[in-house]
From Swiss-Prot:
InterPro entries in the cross-refs: AAA+_ATPase (IPR003593), ABC2_TM (IPR013525), ABC_trans_N (IPR029481), ABC_transporter-like_ATP-bd (IPR003439), ABC_transporter-like_CS (IPR017871), ABCG_PDR_1 (IPR034001), ABCG_PDR_2 (IPR034003), Drug-R_PDR/CDR (IPR005285)
Protein name according to UniProt: Multidrug resistance protein CDR1
Species for this entry: Candida albicans (Yeast)
One annotated GO molecular function: ATP hydrolysis activity
Biased composition (Basic and acidic residues): 8-18
Domain ABC transporter as annotated: residue spans: 150-404, 859-1103
UniProt-listed PANTHER family: ATP-BINDING CASSETTE TRANSPORTER
Organism ancestry: Eukaryota, Fungi, Dikarya, Ascomycota, Saccharomycotina
Amino acid sequence: MSDSKMSSQDESKLEKAISQDSSSENHSINEYHGFDAHTSENIQNLARTFTHDSFKDDSSAGLLKYLTHMSEVPGVNPYEHEEINNDQLNPDSENFNAKFWVKNLRKLFESDPEYYKPSKLGIGYRNLRAYGVANDSDYQPTVTNALWKLATEGFRHFQKDDDSRYFDILKSMDAIMRPGELTVVLGRPGAGCSTLLKTIAVNTYGFHIGKESQITYDGLSPHDIERHYRGDVIYSAETDVHFPHLSVGDTLEFAARLRTPQNRGEGIDRETYAKHMASVYMATYGLSHTRNTNVGNDFVRGVSGGERKRVSIAEASLSGANIQCWDNATRGLDSATALEFIRALKTSAVILDTTPLIAIYQCSQDAYDLFDKVVVLYEGYQIFFGKATKAKEYFEKMGWKCPQRQTTADFLTSLTNPAEREPLPGYEDKVPRTAQEFETYWKNSPEYAELTKEIDEYFVECERSNTRETYRESHVAKQSNNTRPASPYTVSFFMQVRYGVARNFLRMKGDPSIPIFSVFGQLVMGLILSSVFYNLSQTTGSFYYRGAAMFFAVLFNAFSSLLEIMSLFEARPIVEKHKKYALYRPSADALASIISELPVKLAMSMSFNFVFYFMVNFRRNPGRFFFYWLMCIWCTFVMSHLFRSIGAVSTSISGAMTPATVLLLAMVIYTGFVIPTPSMLGWSRWINYINPVGYVFESLMVNEFHGREFQCAQYVPSGPGYENISRSNQVCTAVGSVPGNEMVSGTNYLAGAYQYYNSHKWRNLGITIGFAVFFLAIYIALTEFNKGAMQKGEIVLFLKGSLKKHKRKTAASNKGDIEAGPVAGKLDYQDEAEAVNNEKFTEKGSTGSVDFPENREIFFWRDLTYQVKIKKEDRVILDHVDGWVKPGQITALMGASGAGKTTLLNCLSERVTTGIITDGERLVNGHALDSSFQRSIGYVQQQDVHLPTSTVREALQFSAYLRQSNKISKKEKDDYVDYVIDLLEMTDYADALVGVAGEGLNVEQRKRLTIGVELVAKPKLLLFLDEPTSGLDSQTAWSICKLMRKLADHGQAILCTIHQPSALIMAEFDRLLFLQKGGRTAYFGELGENCQTMINYFEKYGADPCPKEANPAEWMLQVVGAAPGSHAKQDYFEVWRNSSEYQAVREEINRMEAELSKLPRDNDPEALLKYAAPLWKQYLLVSWRTIVQDWRSPGYIYSKIFLVVSAALFNGFSFFKAKNNMQGLQNQMFSVFMFFIPFNTLVQQMLPYFVKQRDVYEVREAPSRTFSWFAFIAGQITSEIPYQVAVGTIAFFCWYYPLGLYNNATPTDSVNPRGVLMWMLVTAFYVYTATMGQLCMSFSELADNAANLATLLFTMCLNFCGVLAGPDVLPGFWIFMYRCNPFTYLVQAMLSTGLANTFVKCAEREYVSVKPPNGESCSTYLDPYIKFAGGYFETRNDGSCAFCQMSSTNTFLKSVNSLYSERWRNFGIFIAFIAINIILTVIFYWLARVPKGNREKKNKK
């Protein structure tokens, strides 16, 4: 075939394939079967024809034209399918034909190109270079060096000209991808595949593109793409991020609405178009049956993982992008499903002129044959780009050998791994070795010269063409009215907001529990809080409580939206993805979220405020109530917008919650109640001016008190002996009272106590609305311009000391060659192969060689049957499975998805937590499993679950110390760890931290560590591996299989599940156990050389012969009907049960049981223990590991320190050196009360780290019997105490001394003892915070639920601790809450320790003036009253008596039920509450999280 035309023979092939395909594609809307076998064969042959030569632009256009007209299509507007009456165009019909629909659409576009203005886009680049500001290795910051690292990085940031700061991610490379071409990007993890795709998609935040790089998109620059056509060039990450409670149909319709073009055809409204497009893609990708099913995620039930991946694909397709960059989109998919996806991309490229690029792992040959172009990357170097059919020939010509049955993609990728590539005989010294040498060879090749010529012509062509103007016209034609032509978005801002509001209402509909619970929760809290102040009297005795109730109402309304920060971070990844797809502006989503939450906010506000207002007995007047509610709802709006702004500017939840908590504290203190306006210190008065909550509180207090008269509740003097005194000689104690008057004006009270005035009432409403609008504008601006989280390259983290050693070692090994790879210098390839494949490994050390544990025991099972109850129906998952695993053998466990492979592993290893084993036996040398079985095996799980803050060596040592026999010395265990490190080839990163994705070990290194953790335990019986190659590239999968072979050759027995392995990988296994659906055995036996024994078995019982070039594993899946679209000719379970091979298996099991049971058993009592290490050792190691985790998490520790320091200092200096007058005593009491405010944030900071430890323990360490549950929970509790004591000590000094409480101990010379006791109380509070968080988390699955529960308990504790309302005011029903409240005793102890035994001196405005009767002095008149009521007086010049109600702080303490004599008792009670928390944590964890009993219940035979 030439570059410009197809031969007539090719045309006939194409026409025949398409016609056959069209006739076979009418499929059901409810189920997606993929292509049938006949169609698959046609497309594969067609793909080989198409990819034999790459089409240039003109030939591609000719092909498209041919495809358009080769079948009779009407070329009508498909969105009118009801009027057209053509089922092939109706996605809701069973006869819908996706290809027919696409061809019809293409013909429609061609019928009126001036109206539809179709567009296409290619890309070409030369000298493309990407670089980052980081290193490939770094050190993990700890508490001691984090600040130094931050400072040095900040210093380096300003060194603009320091080239040492930069490193190349992609070296200079060139390529061209034209419309209609499908390109695959191949390379090992870290080669730069993702960076290349992100660069093409102009998704470069986090790294930089070199100035010398030239990139053009058919004449458009990357700046043009990013600013104006962002949605036409997209990057699709491998993760599936969606709103879990939104249905599939709603998710896709939302994307379709936002990309609905203006030129969609006359008479077609937007809703019709969007629904039709969503239905088309749901039908195309087999999602129609999931239209009304929630998408879900790992925690929310929804569609399956494969369907969720298809939802992501459909959503990206609906964006209508011309260039699509798919990053590892097939990860986790089996080869058949991946092939279906690539076929869909091929169809899109050929028919619709799109330009897809995909980075793919484990690419089958059928999939590779569909690609037009291939890019091969090696450590950031491009070592080949060109036609996919020419790549293999290019490298073979270079001198490399492609092993038999190795796919082309695997061969190309293997060339970037020195341990796997193999030169042809005679080429050992001729082939390039390093990545740089490969690139040099490539750039000197004729293929590269031809490429550069083509690229040069392409750039010249782009300069001459009018693509820029044409593409702009196409883009503008799609845009709706009121949309800027330069905008990358298709619809206007108003429409984006409207669609966003509709989507948010659908989210609420999908999960109505959240708004319902919120409204109900507000109602319940309204009932609880109002009952504390129930039915306040209309006297001056209610003044304080009315103020307290109003204060609490304002705070509750203000801070009810604090948790909106959490929802922001939940939605942020989705919003960022949609921004890159150019669906909507983030600011439009921000505004939509606020509008959509208005009904819920109004309902929540009314449910709380209506109940609270009338139960407290506030002013019962409709106008007063609605003003109260109006101020409260605007207060909610203000704080909602403020908290959202904090969340928008923060990069993490913890980073947002800490400043939010400090801000909350400031607003609480400076509202005007805790510190009345006249009492605020001069330096801090401005805080009240900018505090929106203060304006709300003033207006509500004016609304409640202005114009009202209150009956005086207490007179001075009064009581015995004063019954007949005239009112003119008494005065009311309330502020604002007038001597001789029984009523006190509320207006006067506000003016005297708070300096609040009625003239401010409506003014404050305007100020509050102004704050709301201001913070709304700030929030919208921040969401629009905040770039989000920066992308990070892969970095290996070491401890600081280890990093220096690592760099010295690397420098020494690479001396003289900065580009040297893992095998540098003149290493002979024969020596290299021997080094890699050497399986007689010994560790040379001071103690000589370390031997691998010898295993002579055989594990076998018979008639294993397992069932679970699903919807009240017992379902059999495993059906009478037999088998064995012998030392030195690797047994593969295979089967279709859902066949029960992992379930069988869990049953064999006694790890099932649900369901029942109803029949069968599991035997070791003929004996039943004992209590030590689980620690006698190794189980390598599919998930690589490790603690991020541990190094590789520490993780291995931890496992060795706790799982090897306690008789073995520590030195021997350490030597064995070193042995395993070398065995697994982990020496280079043995001291690296596990880290997280991007900053830590890569996928392969994590998998090796997972295997190592099990090996260092010296499993004496066998090793289970569950999908060890899942998600890995083919080279890594191969290295893992070679590792298993090495272990088996050392005598290890291995049982490994594997999903559709390649022929090379399959050859590493000795035996196969294959399960059909329902857990029924289809085959168990030897594989033989090249799997010939297995092939002979199936051919013997009627299977079609296996082609020589076929992968035996894939052939077997087709035979038994386990591959997509395949159907078995017979039930191979019945074939197996009736076969002679099955009878031989049963006889061998019976023989082993009879003979092995006679062998002597190990009678060592220690060998039968459930855990190898004693409990005290488990506890110490677990506690130390947790302490180290926190130490290496400086972000956690410093955020905790920043929170307590800022909160304590702010608190202390707000009440700086509080005086001992009446207001000063109240201020000191509220300072103690405010000291507890950081509780919630401290709990929220701590819980994620608890969850990390718990996940590692429950997923891996508990089932393997590494240590007991009691050691885990005890270690978690005690390891947190040192940090809590440390931050408590810091908080004590930052709060106690600025507040000046030590001055109160001076008169009694008890500064030191009272200071020590206060320190003990403060640190006890912080310890209590940790234990309360752990208690809430002990039985909770999610940290969010535990945090919400802790918040509820904390709120209840604050309400009933006696500060806002004492026991004499509380309704009788709530007295028990006062008595059972730990904060009651803590507050009493802190107040009595801080305030007792000193004098009170009233401020001038706190005196009340009493005029004694004629002829009496102040002394004779007031002394009787002072004897029983307390206080003191001063005689004024005019003869009146200035009376102060208190003379001693003990009087104040008595009024709040705090006695100095009970301080130690109260401290002891509070410590008892801590102990109760600890005990309940242990009990609840055991009840809720520890598996109890066994899952075995044999049926009676």
